[in-house]
């Protein structure tokens, strides 16, 4: 059995969105080793029910616990909104979500806060609740953006249609005169060049990825689990097509990762089928 400090940090998302968190881990915690899982066979998570999301998260965490990770970062806002509090009580390892770190960062930037997210995250009101717990007088506008994750996973970042979709989602927030925009989905950082074509320069962008990694660093230090030796290569795993994930992730990682397909433990007698993503 390896020393706890040498164990990997588990990171999971529905797809490539969690790579934004992974890059922050490389930057802020370069000596840590990572196990990354993308649940690509079942994305997008944003249209799933809370019950299904909780089942998916339990399956992922059960597998990661068997892999002896020392911590898990839920690099998925939908999972963080709908499952974090429950699974923190069920699993004997530190599990961090992205919403509270994102909310804390948002209120440091402004008081008129727009949040773009998946429909499930928006419906949960998780960001609104988290922001108001910190700053009750902050104004929060939430916008569900169901098309963003499929467009990113289909590598349509430079498609003119994506720009038009983004304009439609962002215009109500601009009409509300927001001063801060929170990426309420880890995928959305990949759309930053698109957003910059639409948003005035005074609107501050908040990406929770960097803030959840800062929280992870602090947690590791408190628990005495920081690794001080050389890291080992990141292990990339998916539930869907490894080649598709590897090709898509190259543009954000700067290298083409070796990706393996794994099978999660099914904790229900009926495992929901993946949603079909249509163009």
Swiss-Prot record:
The keyword Hydrolase does not apply. Its EC number is 5.1.1.3. The keyword Disulfide bond does not apply. Pathway: Cell wall biogenesis; peptidoglycan biosynthesis. PROSITE patterns: ASP_GLU_RACEMASE_1 (PS00923), ASP_GLU_RACEMASE_2 (PS00924). Keywords: Cell shape, Cell wall biogenesis/degradation, Isomerase, Peptidoglycan synthesis. The active site is at 76 (proton donor/acceptor), 185 (proton donor/acceptor). GO terms for biological process: cell wall organization; peptidoglycan biosynthetic process; regulation of cell shape. InterPro entries: Asp/Glu/hydantoin_racemase (IPR015942), Asp/Glu_race (IPR001920), Asp/Glu_racemase_AS_1 (IPR018187), Asp/Glu_racemase_AS_2 (IPR033134), Glu_race (IPR004391). One of its GO terms (molecular function) is glutamate racemase activity. It catalyses: L-glutamate = D-glutamate. Substrate binds at residues 13-14, 45-46, 77-78, 186-187. PANTHER family: GLUTAMATE RACEMASE (PTHR21198:SF2). Provides the (R)-glutamate required for cell wall biosynthesis. Belongs to the aspartate/glutamate racemases family. NCBIfam families: glut_race (TIGR00067). This is Glutamate racemase.
């Amino acid at each position: 059995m390896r020393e706890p400090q040498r164990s990997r940090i588990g990171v999971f998302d529905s797809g490539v969105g969690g790579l934004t968190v992974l890059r922050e881990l490389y930057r802020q915690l370069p000596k840590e080793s990572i196990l990354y899982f993308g649940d690509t066979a079942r994305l997008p998570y944003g249209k799933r029910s809370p019950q299904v999301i909780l089942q998916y998260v339990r399956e992922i965490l059960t597998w990661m616990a068997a892999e002896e990770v020392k911590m898990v970062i839920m690099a998925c806002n939908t999972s963080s909104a709908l499952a974090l509090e429950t699974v923190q009580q069920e699993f004997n390892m530190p599990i961090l979500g992205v919403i509270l770190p994102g909310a804390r960062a948002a209120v440091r930037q402004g008081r008129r806060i727009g949040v773009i997210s998946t429909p499930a995250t928006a419906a949960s009101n998780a960001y609104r609740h988290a922001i108001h717990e910190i700053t009750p007088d902050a104004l929060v506008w939430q916008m569900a953006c169901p098309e963003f994750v499929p467009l990113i996973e289909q590598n349509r970042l430079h498609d003119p249609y994506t720009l038009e979709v983004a304009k439609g989602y962002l215009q109500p927030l601009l009409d509300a005169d927001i001063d801060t925009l929170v990426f309420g989905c880890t995928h959305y950082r990949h759309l930053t060049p698109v957003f910059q074509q639409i948003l005035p320069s005074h609107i501050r962008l908040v990406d929770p990825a960097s803030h959840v990694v800062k929280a992870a660093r602090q947690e590791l230090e408190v628990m005495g689990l920081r690794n001080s030796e050389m890291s080992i290569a990141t292990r990339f795993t998916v539930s869907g097509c490894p080649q598709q994930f590897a090709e898509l992730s190259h543009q954000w990682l700067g290298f083409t990762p070796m990706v393996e397909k794994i099978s999660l433990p099914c904790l229900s007698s009926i495992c929901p089928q993946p949603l079909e993503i249509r163009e």
